[in-house]
Amino acid sequence: MARSVGIDLGTTNSCVAVLEGGEPTVIPNAEGARTTPSVVAFTNSGETLVGEVAKRQAVTNVDRTVRSVKRHMGEAWTMGVDDKTYKPQQISAFILQKLKRDAEAYLGEPVTNAVITVPAYFSDAQRQATKEAGEIAGLAVDRIVNEPTAAALAYGLDKTDKDQTVLVFDLGGGTFDVSLLDISDGVFEVKATNGDNHLGGDDWDQRIVDWLVTQFKNANGIDLAADKMAKQRLQEAAERAKIELSQASETHINLPYITAGAAGPLHLDEKLTRAEFQRMTSDLLERCRTPFNAVMKDAGLNVSQIDEVILVGGSTRMPAVAELVKELAGKDPHKGVNPDEVVALGASLQAGVLKGEVKDVLLLDVTPLSLGIETKGGVMTKIIERNTTIPTKRSEVFTTAEDNQPSVMIQVFQGEREFVRDNKSLGNFELTGLMPAPRGIPQIEVSFDIDANGIVHVHAKDMATGKEQSMTVTGGSALGKDEIDRMVKEAEANAEADKKRREAVEMRNEADALAFRTEKLLDENSDKIPEDTKTPVTEAIATLKETLKGTDNDDEVKAAMDDLNQKASAMGQAIYAAAQQAQAENPQGQDAESASSESGDDTVVDAEIVDDEDEKK
């Protein structure tokens, strides 16, 4: 039976979980880790690397490595590699494919469905792009769930016996959300949410990078920011330093041979204290206050009414962040959840809810931003206010601005500003065929429908003629069905090609090991093997080694392996026959040894057993 999983598609790291026996369980990746770096790289040989292996090679492959692509979801951003152009949805799909593949290996069965989480403050276009990424990866996306809501579900599923007001403070690698929820009798209701889609751990890392660049430039007169490889090393060192400063009061950043000057190689060696780090990032910390205050105001609550605070996202491990949360909420955060895993666990629970495996649970989420259309004068006329529970549907009746207007352009926006120029455009469509009439007479009903994924559908109808037009708002970066289908096929083709490359690499490694083992056995038993058996084996080893020096000759390597295995089998038989002959020629020696043993001699005789079958493998 195909399985459904929960996926936290993160800016810095991603995580996948599944329900096992009714309990949410994190699935380790192929490398054995519980989270996977959200990094994708394209090698010069055409291979696509994802996760830790992509992260490790980033320094030497800067231009062909992508990280933090989540920050570009819903945008018209692209990355060119050789003769191909990749959109954020495709890069994210590579990450999702790896998570899917690792989950299938762990479960031993196909994974076809997923619940994928997004930041609560993601716009419609960003949600649509995330759904498309799942489709490209070969997943049926059952639901898009807000990360704080998923975290609250994982925290509170076994705590529904009493009413609770829970604050979720989610500071990830690239995004920040604050959500306030009521938990009661299995109902998880979001009261308000707010956030910043361009605030996260990456920004703290960048401050360390900027500081290191300044320190090095002041000392050596060289701008490391202009050197791509040096900058990549700085970014990795900054991330490590940030993590270390969460535990220690100071850390040393040492990067030997970071660049070269007129006198030779130059090294970077700096000491960074926690106090200095907090000073250089204090403005980032202050930006966390505004969404918190907005959520409390929108929910109409004060901090004394918060029962529990949940920290989500690796960046909440920074002491300054934890202290800020304690100051804002007036209480210590809950320590019982893993910030890196709780979102994926909650997503797997929601997958279980949708499959009917988890009973008596209802999630009531909200739309994070107001939705409306442009009216005369560029005014943003809101139809659905922010923090409205979804799914929902609202309608308003509008009219024409000019006499005898034959059509109206419905332009859809998302945001809180009074004028559309300051808000995010989600798309537009035209309602044509209006009957000639003075301005203000025609009646046009515009309906907004937000589904459970937070994706917007808009419908316009001329009340006089009955003519209507509708669209799913997808934003300028969204993909058409044909384009998604093409990308799905490309992704499948890439997955098959990568599988063949892995199999080829494994075969060549096996061939190298076979040559080594056979050569070692030959050297250790040279006196027991006749020349007419030894010579073909020696020649077969040499042939295999020479074949391994080539490239794109996998069939030749396989043939050379088979030849060596066959000849090694004859060698094994010769060794075994020699051992039997030696035993037959010296039976009295055995009796003497036995008698000696019986007379109290404790001499131990070591014997090596050569398994002929092993040599054939």
UniProtKB/Swiss-Prot annotation:
Induction comment: By stress conditions e.g. heat shock.
Biased composition (Low complexity): 578-598
Acidic residues composition bias: residue spans: 599-617
SUPFAM superfamilies: Actin-like ATPase domain, Heat shock protein 70kD (HSP70), peptide-binding domain
Molecular-function GO term, any one: ATP-dependent protein folding chaperone
Pfam families per record: HSP70
Transmembrane stretches, start-end: none
Key words, A-Z: ATP-binding, Chaperone, Nucleotide-binding, Phosphoprotein, Stress response
Region (Disordered): 578-617
Domain of life the protein comes from: Bacteria
Residues bearing PTM Phosphothreonine: 175
Family matches, as InterPro entries: ATPase_NBD (IPR043129), Chaperone_DnaK (IPR012725), Heat_shock_70_CS (IPR018181), HSP70_C_sf (IPR029048), HSP70_peptide-bd_sf (IPR029047), Hsp_70_fam (IPR013126)
Family membership: Belongs to the heat shock protein 70 family.
Stated role: Acts as a chaperone.
HAMAP family: DnaK (MF_00332)
Protein name, entry field: Chaperone protein DnaK
Native organism: Cutibacterium acnes
